[in-house]
Amino acid sequence: MPKTTTRTPGRLSGKFWKLLGAATEKNQGRSLAQVKASADYETKAADLDDEQLRKAAELLRLEDLSESADIPQFLAIAREAAERSTSLRPFDVQLLGALRMLAGDVVEMATGEGKTLSGAIAAAGYALGGRSVHVITINDYLARRDAEWMGPLIEALGLTVGWITAESTAEERRRAYTCDVTYASVNEIGFDVLRDQLVTDVADLVSPNPDVALIDEADSVLVDEALVPLVLAGTSHRETPRVELIRMVGELTPGRDFDTDTDSRNVHLTDEGARKLEAKLGGIDLYSEEHVGTTLTEVNVALHAHVLLQRDVHYIVRDDAVHLINSSRGRIAQLQRWPDGLQAAVEAKEGIATTETGEVLDTITVQALINRYPTVCGMTGTALAAGEQLRQFYKLGVSPIEPNKPNIREDESDRVYVTAAAKIDAIIEHIEEVHKTGQPVLVGTHDVAESEELHEKLVKRGVPAVVLNAKNDAEEARVIAEAGKLGAVTVSTQMAGRGTDIRLGGSDEGDHDEVAELGGLHVVGTGRHNTQRLDNQLRGRAGRQGDPGSSVFFSSWEDELVQAHLEPNKRPMQADENGRVLTDKAAALLDHAQRVAEGRLLDVHANTWRYNQLTAQQRAIIVERRDALLRTPTAREELAELSPKRYAELAEELSEERLERICRLIMLYHLDRGWCEHLAYLADIRESIHLRALGRQNPLDEFHRMAVDAFASLAADAIEAAQQTFETAPSFEDEPGVDLSKLARPTSTWTYMVHDNPLADDTMAALSLPGVFR
């Protein structure tokens, strides 16, 4: 069987460096020279006591990192501080990774190479230069773990460190944000930004001005979740979704009443299906002007829920609730939900009471959240494969960091089968064969259903496998930590962001030498993913820090990737008696299908970004306006100009401070109310905008036109409403002042993430936002 051994690449060409987006090979070479120069200061650093080391760090001049002559001294001090405080002595490659992050790059460091320590050193470097650093993780567990783990190093350099999780109170969050380095998950930072858009007093603000974002698992945050909207919702009296309509749609017959496209991304009613529903709904016309943007939209959403979203693939049902599965991580997507109509449709499909959604008070995508930071850098094990997206959407370069020890993992070429059944049989036999030797096996599957099917078959064959998926992800740290033990067989969904290294011999490395002698960890993939990056994340679990390891992927012509992205006439069907495809070109054909899938994913990202970009620009204008109302006398000055008579009356009764507060509350209320209604309008447009194509209109152009028109009137309407309230709000009978009780804000708010449905369109319309508040 053909194998390839993954080894450290040699010197990269200058052309390749430019393609990566890193400044130049010369800059990487300069960083390497600075790492080597740091050796000259190591003895001096070692001779300092802890207090002297801290003072030496404080004396460093790191304000201008690109020109600072103190970089070598900083590296020597950081290395010494790390060894004293964490018992970890950074390798040269870890210092190099830190320097490239200090240069504003995303670094690619293989699994097990010490990204966490490298990131902490980079964060300390920025902080010593006077910058405020947010180390952004993909979940609360990693935020707290890394802050507590790396905190002693950061504090040894005279800096402060804090962390934030979902349980943190407002006061704890404020304290954490005042630290030099703050660890927090991307969603918690986003939710703090959103909640700050409801405060009516500067003292209630929590989130500081963004400065430096250092992102762990950067490709996961910046690419996989870039377009995930974070949402702040409040109580409202919205209509309950029509459960009966959702059930009617569930009774439709596939092929006769509705059809799906070839890659099962879209579903639509047939004429017969439309007639059947129209009859059940009392003889209405679904395509009439009255129903096309309401009832027909509900029908399409219900179809999506019933046909395209599969239980144990896209979501699981646990504790009488629907939990979304993060497709790139294979675990429950905490706090995430689909757009309101789709969430309710899935809940109705599963016979679960629909959950309260409220109204959206504010929203921001992860991409827009990160783009607020003047400086962005990060680290991941698979940055190169995401290089194009990082350049296109964030203008970030990628710096690959060579491993401390050469990677000697052996990657076997794909084993390809004609049918999925033959592939599964071959996987079971292969795992059983490897398990008999005692070599630990890690099996990476695509979804919960596949992991459970494989686990069940292995157990029936006497293989003592353990399974890790979205249903038991609370046990992941323990399961993954022991996946390298002698004889272990672990079946897991996606491995991205698991945050725990697999050490040969188990967590205590007791059987390390014996497992290494057997060939190290053996990784089995049950099929290619839509992106090579996810394949590499799975493979990268083997061959950690120069350990031996191996990997092999099993695929079939019936796999989803092949069905959607490789034409049937390009799939060779000649196979052996076990159903394995004989041609040597099979792996190349899979590569082709994967490239097509990656291209489509990039298109989807770009097209969805085009819809979100306008909302992000409009939100930025609202934020600027709100900040002015909150921090300056703008509200009082504008209302004094608009309603001079009423202002003069109140000025005689009230102190300037109290009058200013009343004006601010009125202006903020109507601005927030207008933005909330504008977001609801945009959501309604997006749910039905694809129907514009039926009238030969470009959906994106129409969305932009309607959104810009509505936003232009938002400003005037908010100011007019504020003026009316200011003039008509009754005065209190017993004391000076104005009764603002009718300006009721939501009695409760909550946050969640929306697992959005991308809108595909190839045209980017030119945007121009009016200076609506100017």
Swiss-Prot record:
Matching InterPro entries, A to Z? Answer: Helicase_ATP-bd, Helicase_C-like, P-loop_NTPase, SecA, SecA_Actinobact-type, SecA_CS, SecA_DEAD, SecA_motor_DEAD
| SMART domains the record matches | SecA_DEAD (SM00957), SecA_PP_bind (SM00958)
Q: Does the keyword Magnesium apply?
A: no
Where are the coiled-coil regions? none
How is this protein positioned relative to the membrane? Peripheral membrane protein
- May I have one GO cellular component term? cell envelope Sec protein transport complex
Sequence similarity: Belongs to the SecA family.
What is the protein named?
Protein translocase subunit SecA 2
